[in-house]
Amino acid sequence: MGKYMRKGKVSGEVAVMEVGGALLGVRTRSRTLALQRTTSSQKPPEKGEGDPGAGAGAGAEYLELRSRRLEKPPPHTPPAKEKETARRASAAAAAAVRMPAAPQAAEEFEAEVEVSFGDNVLDLDGDAMERSTRETTPCSLIRSSEMISTPGSTTKTNTSISSRRRMETSVCRYVPSSLEMEEFFAAAEQQQHQAFRERYNFCPVNDCPLPGRYEWTRLDC
């Protein structure tokens, strides 16, 4: 231990304080040699032939510390990932096996479509014609089976003209007579005459005045 002396400026007293040698910043030769021996004794031994870590494979790694040596295990692959990889490999192999049979199946499918294409068109046309006839044709325009012929440009024109005439005939078939029209308007006409007589005390049917608040005078032209 060294001593550090401090002298006061005012009173002139001297204070003595003991401080460790490490704080003084002075290193002797004996302390330097002792520190070197301590450092060399703490260095880990180098790997030799007898070291178990020298012959280990790539899967085992070691972490060296001052006091002991720890082994780092290799990363473990989860089983779910291994199953997924195996499933993809099997699916790819199965797809490669099924590839040669695909062109033959496609040719058979095209042949079946070509054979049944005409029948499907005829069935669809028949259903569409039946549906349109059932939904849009009035009862008065339904023709008998004897009048139906093969469709064509001339037949289409004649059909449109005949259907138009038939519609005009059905609309203008009933014309009321004059007597029926008079009976239809008679009730409304009587109501108007009654309202006129009560308001103006004059009869428009007989063309003569009636007793009331108005006084009527005949004009001689």
From Swiss-Prot:
Cleaved signal peptide residues: none
Q: Which UniProt keywords apply?
A: Protein kinase inhibitor
Region annotation (Disordered) ranges: 27-92
Q: What does the record say about induction? A: By auxin. Down-regulated by cytokinin.
Compositionally biased, Basic and acidic residues: which spans?
63-87
GO BP field:
regulation of cell cycle
Q: Name one GO molecular function term.
A: cyclin-dependent protein serine/threonine kinase inhibitor activity
| Any one Gene Ontology cellular component term annotated for this protein | nucleus
Specify residue ranges for compositional bias: Polar residues. 31-42
Q: What does the similarity note say?
A: Belongs to the CDI family. ICK/KRP subfamily.
Record-given protein name: Cyclin-dependent kinase inhibitor 5
Organism name: Oryza sativa subsp. japonica (Rice)
Q: What is the lineage of its organism?
A: Eukaryota, Viridiplantae, Streptophyta, Embryophyta, Tracheophyta
